[in-house]
């Protein structure tokens, strides 16, 4: 004998009464219930109505499992008649524990969404015995495909970067993100990374929120920088990510290393050259990251190539400037001093970086204002790459936006 009161407690739904329980097979229970709530709201005029007009057609709703059983709640919604509207419209009662036209209770939908975090439609489909289309329908109902600006109070710092939707293709999308109330949020997935597309997105941000933006973090792509400048103007600092900058000046050292290693292969004995094994990895590390063996190999390389030593030391010096707790003005002076050292060295491996440095002087030195990086954007890029691999190369931007939101914010939303 099933105790209806205990079963009602397990269901976790109030204002209902269990009429009967049917065990259809060893895996499925159907619980027939009725609402104890009275009244509804007219779908015509929106006013409260209490004139009972019978019951609507029976509906089945998938609910949370109990003791390993699939659970379906079976209910005939009460209907009420409006005495005000012409034609005396009738309306079905809407209860707060399920959404009209959904085949699941709200609790079950949220359970499905939690299962989908860091997972795939296919895996959840197998686990819950649901079709992937049914799961995607829940996703579409609960997660928007664009950011909802209404609850957002401020943006402060915006990050923007790009990612290829298809491996090996130049099918790039721009990713715009921000920390909102301590949570990393994607606020835009743009079909193009052009200046016009990014500018249009920035202009789509409500004026009240555009006024709260203090900094835009980006790589050195001209389209992103130009779009941010055209919309936000001089009031907002455009900050070139220090790690993109570091990649450029470190590339200069690496290019020099390749040339010097080719020269050393010709000039050194095989034994002496082999003693420089793994030098290509070692030169890419900072001194404090090296092991004792790696330091010996690096010093050996420096003995054979003073030019690499000089370039390596200049690279380390610029990194030290970035790491130092200095103001923007101090940072500018230190970098100008570094540029003079490069000029005095007569090294040419930094020429490309120096050209970029002169072209984007303000954006690069804006890092020292608040020591901001777009590292959170790079982390988000890696997250999206994982989602794409896990979801078998998802290319639909709307679905990608939903999946990124779910993985980043799903636990807080559906806890």
Identify the residue ranges that each predicted region occupies.
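N-terminal alpha-helical interaction blocks
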Residues: 1-38
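Short, conserved catalytic/metal-binding motifs centered on acidic residues
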Residues: 31, 42, 82, 124, ...
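Residues immediately within or flanking Cys/His clusters that coordinate Zn2+
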Residues: 38-40, 79
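Short, positively charged, Gly/Tyr-enriched micro-motifs
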Residues: 46, 55, 60-169, 211, ...
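RNase H-like nuclease fold core
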Residues: 136-217, 222-230, 234
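Conserved beta-strand -> loop -> alpha-helix junction used to position metal-binding or nucleic-acid-contacting
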Residues: 219-222, 229-270, 378
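Helix-loop elements that line ligand-binding/catalytic pockets
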Residues: 272-346
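Basic, amphipathic alpha-helical segments enriched in Lys/Arg and hydrophobic/aromatic residues
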Residues: 339-415
């Amino acid at each position: 004998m099933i105790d209806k009161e205990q079963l009602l407690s397990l269901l976790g739904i109030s204002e209902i009464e269990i009429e009967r329980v049917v065990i259809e097979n060893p895996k499925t229970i159907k619980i027939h219930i009725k609402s104890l709530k009275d009244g509804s709201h007219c779908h015509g005029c929106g006013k409260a109505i209490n004139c009972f007009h019978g019951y609507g057609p029976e509906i089945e709703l998938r609910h949370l499992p109990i003791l390993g059983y699939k659970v379906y709640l079976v209910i005939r919604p009460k209907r009420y008649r409006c005495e005000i509207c012409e034609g005396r419209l009738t309306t079905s009662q809407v209860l707060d524990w399920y959404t009209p036209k959904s085949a699941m209770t709200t609790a079950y939908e949220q359970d499905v969404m939690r299962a989908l975090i860091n997972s795939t439609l296919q895996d959840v489909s197998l686990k819950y015995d649901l079709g992937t289309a049914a799961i995607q329908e829940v996703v579409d109902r609960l997660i928007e495909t664009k950011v909802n600006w209404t609850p957002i109070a401020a943006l402060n710092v915006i990050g923007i970067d790009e990612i290829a939707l298809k491996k090996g293709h130049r099918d790039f999308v721009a990713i715009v993100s921000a920390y909102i109330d301590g949570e990393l949020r994607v606020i835009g997935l743009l079909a193009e990374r052009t200046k016009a597309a990014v500018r249009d997105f920035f202009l789509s941000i409500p004026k009240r929120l555009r006024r709260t933006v203090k900094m835009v973090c980006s790589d050195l792509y001209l389209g992103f920088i130009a779009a941010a400048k055209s919309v936000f103007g001089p009031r907002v600092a455009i900050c070139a990510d220090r790690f993109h900058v570091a990649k450029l000046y470190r590339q200069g050292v690496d290019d020099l290393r390749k040339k010097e290693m080719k020269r050393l292969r010709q000039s050194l004995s095989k034994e002496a050259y082999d003693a420089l094994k793994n030098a290509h990895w070692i030169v890419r590390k900072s001194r404090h990251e090296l092991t004792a063996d790696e330091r010996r190999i690096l010093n050996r390389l420096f003995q054979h190539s003073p030019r690499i030593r000089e370039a390596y030391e200049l690279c380390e010096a610029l990194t030290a400037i970035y790491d130092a707790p200095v103001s923007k003005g101090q940072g500018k002076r230190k970098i100008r001093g570094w540029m003079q050292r490069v000029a005095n060295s007569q090294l040419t491996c930094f020429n490309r970086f120096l050209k970029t440095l002169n072209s984007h002087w303000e954006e690069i030195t804006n890092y020292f204002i608040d020591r901001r990086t777009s590292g959170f954007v790079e982390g988000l890029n890696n997250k999206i790459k994982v989602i794409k691999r896990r979801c078998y190369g998802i290319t639909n931007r709307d679905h990608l936006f939903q999946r990124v939101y779910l993985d980043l914010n799903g636990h807080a939303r559906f806890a």
